Amino acid sequence: MTCPHCAAALTARERTGQVCAHCERPFALDPKSHGRGMNDLRIRRIAAAATDDGRLKVTVTQLWYLTRTYSGAWGPTPAHGIRPFVRWLLALPLALPLFLWSAFSDGLWATLTGAAALAVVGTAALAKRRTPGRSGGSLITPAESRFRQLMDDRWRSTYGRLPPGVVDDGPRAPAVRESPVGRPAAVILCTDHAVAVFLRVNGIPARLRARLVEAEPAAAHEALVDVPGRLPVVVLHDASALGALLAPLLRLAHPDRVVLDAGLPVTAVRNRRGAVHRVSAAPPVDADGLRAVAGLSDEDAAWLSDGYWSPLAAVPPSRLESVVTAAVKRALTARPGALGAADGFLTWPAGEPTPAGTTSRTKGAPAG
């Protein structure tokens, strides 16, 4: 690896204990110890790009998604094969009479019945063994807990703070002070904590004269109780089943209110190369309901009903900023009931198709 201080190419022996043997200065990460792609220069480079060279601040969660070296997701697989009990329950009643017939017969009949009995037993013994079903899952390398540990322990102990422009959004992090908004003109309803911290720390709601409301999708209706009904609502959510249903259900509950869906659309990530795909452990949502309520295509509804989802926090920060800005401006000029299911998706990029029938796998920024 390359020393982040003197740029010397270091062998394993020249970087023992995360200290450069040439300049004798410590560094935080070593790919050999902390995993592929985990080195100071790469983390700094990705953080600089994410913050637009210092113009924006980003969260540790956003940096984690951007610095991942691998992500993959797989759907559930049904059980297949025959249970041993069933195999022998069928085979023994057939094989036993044949063995008896062979034992008490002579000549050709004994040979044929004996061979048939052996064939039945052999088929039962060699039949495909039952493989239990497997639930879907996903994998991101490094894991979020591991990445946070590296940032909190190794990086802070080496440099005294997180990379420039990166803020902690963990559960123990202090709350971010939000710039005051005198008379808000709109509401931004955000269901992702990392994205809400990103918006607050960059003063985006105040700049747009919007009130930021953070809530889980299931609690979104209650979170809007204290918000004046005249204010338009811009909804930010993951590309998930609950996220896709949120804006349509809010429109039904508040027919006199502008509700603009600016969440991450499934069409932008389902077949997009490089998008992060994850699998939820929550009970599946019926595909028919997703089509009827959210107006999704058959393919998108099936993808979500299989448990797949994609996090809003994985969207590049500059793209996220531009989408939120455009969505609030659009909501301010819209009329109640005039927005359809596709409105709010106009600023999101279309997905780049991937070969059908393959496991969802994406790689993060180059690990070099």
Protein language model regions, located:
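Acidic beta-strand-to-loop metal/phosphate-binding motif
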Residues: 228-242
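Nucleic-acid enzyme cleavage-core boundary/entry regions
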Residues: 1-231, 246-368
